[in-house]
Amino acid sequence: MTTIYNTLTRQKEPFSPIDPENVRMYVCGMTVYDYCHLGHARVMVVFDMIARWLRECGYPLTYVRNITDIDDKIIARAAENGETIGKLTARFIQAMHEDADALGVLRPDIEPKATENIPQMIAMIETLIQNGKAYPAANGDVYYAVREFAAYGQLSGKSLDDLRAGERVEVDGFKRDPLDFVLWKAAKAGEPAWESPWGNGRPGWHIECSAMSENLFGDTFDIHGGGADLQFPHHENEIAQSVGATGHTCGHHHAQTHHGQSIASHVKYWLHNGFIRVDGEKMSKSLGNFFTIREVLKQYDPEVVRFFILRAHYRSPLNYSDAHLDDAKGALTRLYTTLKNTPPADPMPSEAGDDYTRRFYVAMNDDFDTVKAVAVLFELAGEVNKTNDAQLAGRLKALGGIIGLLQRDPTEFLQGGAASDGLSNEEIEDLIARRKQARADKNWAESDRIRDLLNEHKIILEDNAGGTTWRRG
């Protein structure tokens, strides 16, 4: 039985899907105006791991991750670059897919784009107005009236009064309440716009996800995920919109928030992954401590980055530094070295192997605890190193594969590495051949010179009876 920590109820709950034959998960994706950063990498890898695990448990899963392809930042960046919005977003969607593929992230089943779902957004806004949950303002915008939704604040755990006191809310004379948020923005000169009952304009960000998830999944669904930064206001607003439009909620067993509200959500389980921190501070563009996936992949193998993300619990903050990535590289190298030294065979049932599998499953079923699951992989690798048991090595590879690790040829991983290491594989092989000749000629000075040169490039040699093997350090 899988248990999941539900942000909405603030507790771990047994995973019991609405329809076990049709499990549905929606994750907020990228706003495509720039290259993806490490925070995006964490969202992609974490929910890829969760999707893989649910499928491993036999659930028929439909995984949707949306693409925000219309937004203030997109409009501004396209204008700055002097290119069309379509050209800009197409370029960064392709870059996002390249980054995700490199990190071993399987493509979601559906990737809806906001611009392809405008009619659904307009229809939902019309319903919200009819239901008394939204109002058109004199400036041509349409706002959601938060005081008309009794459960507003349930996800962030704050009352409307708390939120008004604590949030920096921009003053807007057209709103009835400072916390009211925009559903439809009136057109501005030179910006893309669509026709609507309230005049030309474009959707607000929050309505996009409500309309796309309802269009694909219906009124209620199982899992909604995203980064912790989306909990408020984005996900809070999604609940208000979706429940405000349809009136349909998932039963949360009459649960209440800590200030006594009834819980009313169209999603049964809300999941949020933790922030990435750099030197103890949240990674963000404004602080300038910001790394794109591409920058990191110039230094580190993509599987090292995936492993670095999965070594931490998905809800914990993840501290980024070169030292932490070097540590992840060393740890993953140890696992691949085990598989190189004991080539895996198809695992057969065995008492020892079955016990490792059971413990791996127990860890993953406990709110996707990859920290404990990875610890099981290291224990299993230790056993393989002691016994040289090819079937246990096969078990190690198979368990790693469940979370998207250890599927490459070990030699290819160990000899691969960032191009910035300076020496190509061919140059390394050539130097090793020259060193071998120098040793045969008893030219120890030349042999040592070549070893030192390789050492400078972090190439580690291992001399054994069958010759010399190497890997990148």
Swiss-Prot record:
Catalytic activity: tRNA(Cys) + L-cysteine + ATP = L-cysteinyl-tRNA(Cys) + AMP + diphosphate
Signal peptide range: none
Cofactor: Zn(2+)
Pfam families xref list: CysS_C, DALR_2, tRNA-synt_1e
An MF annotation (GO) of this entry: ATP binding
EC number(s) given by UniProt: 6.1.1.16
Cofactor note: Binds 1 zinc ion per subunit.
Domain of life: Bacteria
Keywords, ordered alphabetically: Aminoacyl-tRNA synthetase, ATP-binding, Cytoplasm, Ligase, Metal-binding, Nucleotide-binding, Protein biosynthesis, Zinc
Any single GO CC term annotated in Swiss-Prot or TrEMBL for this entry: cytoplasm
GO BP annotations listed: cysteinyl-tRNA aminoacylation
Binding site for ATP: K285
Motif ('KMSKS' region): 282-286
Chain location of the short sequence motif 'HIGH' region per the record: 30-40
SMART domains linked: DALR_2
Record's keyword annotation contains Cytoplasm: yes
Binding annotation for Zn(2+): C28, C209, H234, E238
Compartments, as annotated in UniProt: Cytoplasm
InterPro entries, alphabetized: Cys-tRNA-ligase, Cys-tRNA-synt_Ia_DALR, Cys-tRNA/MSH_ligase, CysS_C, Rossmann-like_a/b/a_fold, tRNA-synt_1_cat_dom, tRNAsynth_Ia_anticodon-bd
Quaternary assembly: Monomer.
Family: Belongs to the class-I aminoacyl-tRNA synthetase family.
Name of the protein described by the UniProt record: Cysteine--tRNA ligase
Organism: Neisseria meningitidis serogroup B (strain ATCC BAA-335 / MC58)
Gene (name only): cysS
